[in-house]
């Protein structure tokens, strides 16, 4: 089921609409939510949990699990320009926890999806287009890398 919620700033007006499951065209999803749906669909061997943690700043968006490799985390980012923006807490997380943690970036204009190691965060802050990725637009390869026993797969 899909609920659309629109709030008008300045005037306290909330419009809550229930839309049938099969008519999602009336609900607009944020680009990060669309990326989340794409990740779930294209990585079936991974059990995903989307984290919306306001109490632990910097924690990545996704917790992944597979019986063979255990847990790992992924940050989802939408690139609207050459630089990817990260909060100071996100930067600290990826710099201090580079093993088994990843960053998945989707280019907003081209739609390309790229997988990066956490250690690539410094390059992503400058220009994601010039930062070497582990995989581009190859979901089978992305899934294999996420499931690899070591982050240097």
List where the protein language model places each region.
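Charged phosphate-binding loop/patch that engages nucleotide di/tri-phosphates or the phosphate backbone
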Residues: 131-153
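Beta-rich catalytic cores
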Residues: 58
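Nucleic-acid nuclease catalytic cores
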Residues: 95-122
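Short strand-connecting beta-turns/loops that link adjacent beta-strands
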Residues: 67-69, 109-110
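Acidic-basic catalytic patches of nuclease active cores, encompassing PD-(D/E)XK
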Residues: 6, 11-53, 67, 152-153
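Acidic, Ser/Thr-rich peripheral helices and adjacent loops at domain boundaries
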Residues: 123-128
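Conserved catalytic cores of phosphodiester-cleaving nucleases, focusing on short active-site segments
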Residues: 62-64, 70-80
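Mg2+/Mn2+-dependent nuclease catalytic core
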Residues: 79-97
